[in-house]
Amino acid sequence: MAKEKFDRSKSHANIGTIGHVDHGKTTLTAAISTVLHKKSGKGTAMAYDQIDGAPEERERGITISTAHVEYETETRHYAHVDCPGHADYVKNMITGAAQMDGAILVVSAADGPMPQTREHILLSRNVGVPYIVVFLNKCDMVDDEELLELVEMEVRDLLSDYDFPGDDVPVIKGSALKALEGDADYEAKIFELMDAVDEYIPTPERDTEKPFMMPVEDVFSITGRGTVATGRVERGQVKVGDEVEIIGLQEENGKTTVTGVEMFRKLLDYAEAGDNIGALLRGVSREDIQRGQVLAKPGTITPHSRFKAEVYVLSKEEGGRHTPFFANYRPQFYFRTTDVTGIVHLPEGTEMVMPGDNTEMEVELISTIAIEEGTRFSIREGGRTVGSGVVSSIIK
């Protein structure tokens, strides 16, 4: 069978299902793929077992089970992630293994919000999932309209507690199982849900459209031409003649102009997100720039040394620590291309953090580095990874 060509005319978004265990995340994922496939013949109809038996993957040394499902609506192509276990969600969201432009929060109408409902909303807030659409599931099991309204209010309040616009979030009431079984009324609810996702979750800005940034991996001098910084462009575009800043690991940001862009020894007019390049920098000496800094469009990212983060600590089985750590723990924080020592401050009431836990923490780095909300990092001890995290807010 010939491979289907990827249709680029539709915009693309990454989404996922979140919510408490057994509230119907996987059933909903199966229902969406099945109902949409039935209508358009595109994508693949996935059964519950195919999604639930997701293979384990290794992402930054962490074992995560994730199911990847794709489907399309009339206007968009979606990549959808669903995780079998709660721990998989935590790891997935913190490591960014599955980037989400928006999430469908599944809440059982029969049970209402539960502890993991709250935890997944908090995680979404901390790791920067920008939009949430709610699916109240199992509505076929609740015949009291007032009860449904009560659960909806509870979910909206919970979202507002974590700075999501609880009053404006779309809430769709349905039954994933009934839709999967082919009940037309409940299939209609799946279309209603996907219309809400299409409309409420904006198309993400592509990496190439964002302001330029490239982590510096290596630096060398070319006699008679100047200093070259190499690395993979993380976002945006850069062309000859652009002014860039050199940020991190030093008191002052350096400013310079890109006088040449090379890829595979060929000169380019410009480079964009995903390209591995060498950038020739005007008037910069070999000592002015080092691995671990970033080149960026002036004024778009700033160096910081203190931030709050959401962190997952590797379990012993994943090659992590065998013992807990306490406040004032001083590991290395690996950002993009370099390690920086930092001091950990734990939240009030948290005495210690065990391997396999996830926690919020405050980190104080010994030197500044270019970071912003949503920047990912690893925590390392002597070169081995013991944790993974994401910056949730900047302090200074």
Curated annotation (Swiss-Prot):
The keyword RNA-binding does not apply. It is found in: Cytoplasm. GTP binds at residues 19-26, 82-86, 137-140. Residues 10-205 form the tr-type G domain. One of its GO terms (molecular function) is GTP binding. Its main location: cytoplasm. Disulfide bonds: none annotated. It holds the Pfam family GTP_EFTU_D3. Residues 82-85 are annotated as: G3. Residues 175-177 are annotated as: G5. Mg(2+) binds at T26. GO terms for cellular component: cytosol. It catalyses: GTP + H2O = GDP + phosphate + H(+). Keywords: Cytoplasm, Elongation factor, GTP-binding, Hydrolase, Magnesium, Metal-binding, Nucleotide-binding, Protein biosynthesis. Residues 19-26 are annotated as: G1. Its EC number is 3.6.5.3. Transmembrane segments: none annotated. Residues 61-65 are annotated as: G2. Residues 137-140 are annotated as: G4. Monomer. Belongs to the TRAFAC class translation factor GTPase superfamily. Classic translation factor GTPase family. EF-Tu/EF-1A subfamily. GTP hydrolase that promotes the GTP-dependent binding of aminoacyl-tRNA to the A-site of ribosomes during protein biosynthesis. This is Elongation factor Tu.
